[in-house]
């Protein structure tokens, strides 16, 4: 839930107008909107490159994943792994635009650990892949934008553990 929605829900629950502090937080949120949209656009525009870089980094760091018997062994399973990385990148962009982790949580990470466990997918490798996405994104973004985006990647990694 965005800061705007949270503030309105809280004020309405107390049958009051928004407080000066709530209005200041909303003002800051709105002022940061251009940055959040710029970051999301850059990640979206470069998603194929970012996913490929992250996959390459993951497979170099975790060759067991793409070796015979690994969860990403073979062309089809490697494509599935890259599809999952693309999915997490998309979730990160949702969180960035919202300025909140709620979309990430509600759309994508609830129950994901259990799903990967049931599939025999090494969850730590998925987390490593998301960290690789964060690294790839940081080379594309300014330091300030990378710091803003980084917290959303970190949230996904934390949710996977």
Curated annotation (Swiss-Prot):
Q: Does the keyword Electron transport apply?
A: yes
Which domain of life, per UniProt?
Answer: Bacteria
User: Where in the sequence is N4-methylasparagine found?
Assistant: 71
Its annotated compartments are:
Cellular thylakoid membrane
| One Gene Ontology biological process | photosynthesis
Key words of the record:
Antenna complex, Bile pigment, Chromophore, Electron transport, Membrane, Methylation, Photosynthesis, Phycobilisome, Thylakoid, Transport
Post-translational modification (record)? Contains one covalently linked phycocyanobilin chromophore. The chromophore is added by phycocyanobilin lyase CpcS 1.
GO cellular component terms, alphabetically, are: phycobilisome; plasma membrane-derived thylakoid membrane
Q: Where is this protein chiefly located? A: membrane
Membrane topology annotation: Peripheral membrane protein
Q: Which Pfam family is one of those matched by this entry?
A: Phycobilisome
Residues that, per the record, bind (2R,3E)-phycocyanobilin: 81
Does this UniProt record's set of keywords contain Membrane? Answer: yes
Q: Record's SUPFAM superfamilies?
A: Globin-like (SSF46458)
Q: What does this protein do?
A: Light-harvesting photosynthetic bile pigment-protein from the phycobiliprotein complex. Allophycocyanin has a maximum absorption at approximately 650 to 653 nanometers.
User: What quaternary arrangement does the UniProt entry report?
Assistant: Heterohexamer of two alpha chains, one alpha-B chain and three beta chains.
- Which protein family is it in? Belongs to the phycobiliprotein family.
This protein's name: Allophycocyanin subunit alpha 1
| Organism expressing this protein natively | Nostoc sp. (strain PCC 7120 / SAG 25.82 / UTEX 2576)
* Gene field: apcA1
């Amino acid at each position: 839930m965005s800061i705007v929605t949270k503030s309105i829900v809280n004020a309405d629950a107390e049958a009051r107008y928004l407080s000066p502090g709530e209005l200041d937080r909303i003002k800051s949120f709105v002022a940061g909107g251009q940055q959040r949209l710029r970051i999301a656009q850059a990640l979206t525009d470069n998603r194929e490159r970012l996913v490929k870089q992250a996959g390459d980094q993951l497979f170099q760091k975790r060759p067991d994943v793409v070796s015979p018997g690994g969860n990403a062994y073979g062309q089809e399973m490697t494509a599935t792994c890259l599809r999952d990385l693309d999915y997490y990148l998309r979730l990160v962009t949702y969180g960035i635009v919202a300025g909140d982790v709620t979309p990430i949580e509600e759309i994508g990470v609830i129950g994901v650990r259990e799903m990967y466990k049931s599939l025999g997918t090494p969850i730590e490798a998925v987390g490593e892949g998301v960290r690789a996405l964060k690294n790839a994104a940081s080379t594309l973004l300014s330091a300030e934008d990378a710091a803003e985006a980084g917290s959303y990647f970190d949230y996904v990694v934390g949710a996977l553990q």
